[in-house]
Amino acid sequence: MSHRWKFILACTLLTTLPQAAYAWNSVGHMAVAKLVYDRLDDGHKKKLFTLLQSHPHYERYLAAGRPDNVSEVEWAIVRTSVWPDWVRPRGDKDSRGAEVTRYHRPEDHYVNVPFIDPKDAAVFAGKTLIDPDLTNILDALKQRCNEVRTKTTADIDKAIAVCWIFHLVGDIHQPLHNVAYFNDTKDYRRGDLGGNLFGVRAGGQRVKLRAYWDNLLGDDSNYADDSANHQARIFREALKVADSLRGLQLADAEQKKLADNTTFKSWSQESFELAKCVGYRQSDGKILAGVPAPFKGPIPEAAPEVGDDYIKTARATAEVRIVLAGQRLAERLKLVLGK
């Protein structure tokens, strides 16, 4: 057995134990949403669709650009999953205005759980590395689910909350959205922001580790392209991914996760363990080689290659996480929407 598979097996054992009580890109998020859509009964689809028609961006985004061969119900529901990324500010050239970007909640997409390089454990022992009062994806998911459950919540707010639930359940299953890597160097003493400051090469391409994982399921290099042709292409790519994963047989360990891990915290803990055991590990089990990368700007030329074994393992891990996200999100939606 290779060193990498030994680490994956160790992670599987860890994450199946009882837990103390930019995420996938558009392709990945919409693939999760499509898997969810196919698991919902007609009654829940109708209830979701009715709610979404109260959304402030229903005509402008959720229903916009629909291809002729896709029903409005399916198109709108699947696109809920990427709306929270669509409202992100796009810099000085963003002409959409505050009517769109006012809904942006940057801290809601992730939680920075510290992963300390084992060789530096003594350096960080006893230190508070992440402000415990910062809001994060766990808080956001609880709040949005409660908003949908509460009868007095206005339909417009429920529609917005539904979009966040679709998106954040996808995010919480992306390992790099649940971690921050620390080591005793000037570049990582405050963490790497979930791989956003960690540069590598994958297949010869320089990329931040976070972005590499976000893009594992498909390419959406021009996320700001709102044209109907581009959005239809992304939708088709997502359907291909969903179709390829629909018949994926989960291993017994993953089936046990579905049965045992039913809380947002337990889903995040699964992702954190995978980040430690797969996301930041080389094929020999050592911490992944990488170089400090600027949050904005080019990846340094010195970025090392992750290797074919890492690429294959990362892809396989992402596929399982997408399937788990789809099944869990479908069940959670049934719970919060009611009969």
Where do the model's predicted regions map?
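Bacterial N-terminal signal peptides
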Residues: I8-P18
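N-terminal, motif-rich segments that launch catalysis or mediate targeting to/interaction with membranes
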Residues: Y22-L168, P175-K339
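Extreme N-terminus of proteins, especially the signal/transit-peptide cleavage junction
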Residues: S2, Q19-A23
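Bacterial N-terminal signal peptides that target proteins for export
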Residues: M1-I8
